[in-house]
Amino acid sequence: MLILLFGGASAASLAGLLAARAQQASREHRVAIVAASDPVAELALGGGNPHYEAFLGELRRLGYVEGRNLVIERYSGEGRTARYAELVREVVSRNPDLIFATTSLLVRQFKEATATIPIVGFTADPVAYGIVTSLARPGGNVTGISADAGVELWGKRLEFLRKAVPNSARVGFLTYRLSWEGAQGHVLREATRAAGIELLGPPLDDPVQPPEYKRVVTLMIQQQADALIVGDTSINFTFRKLIVDLAEANRLPAIYPDRDYLRLGG
């Protein structure tokens, strides 16, 4: 069954897979952590990213300690989706005991690249993105963690935003192209159309770095956006402080995907 977990609890799933794999492997386990956009320096204890702090801290609590019985190989796509295919090939060629990957696109590409290496993914709705056919029976070598209660949630977020900003006629959707053109974007477009609201882009394109965020938000402001919906992507989480600052600087009311944005002033 696909495991729907949050924060440090995901490490328990990873530790269980490591334990099962250890029956066939040496006492030293190799895990590849592959981030969509987070800097490699953040993929460690003390790196400042709350997700990896919880993840690696729980692994340590369960007895998996880097430098003792755990080797962690760290990779980042640096917000460049065009790099993902090359990154996937490199990681799979090194044949780690397990791959932990963030973002739906990366997890799907890993699934297509290997049927033997266990994959733990942090994704949006895994069924909607074609990672598994069923939550109850995902099959194959993929399990994971999803913070997405389903694409229908995006319609609800629009409802909440309209209550907070009742006169909003034009709403920006800040997300990268895969999400914009995929299930999330489709549901949100249908919801805005039904409400008589114009959904504004453009989507974020490679390389998804601070200049691209500034470009997209500037274009939304030029289109007279009344409010902003922030997509729940790994790339957005990497640049959450920048997103909050851009919304504040442009006096743009925003609805965010999780409380980490609120802690930064969103």
Regions found by a protein language model. Give the residues of each.
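Short hydrophobic alpha-helices and adjacent helix-cap/hinge residues
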Residues: 1-266
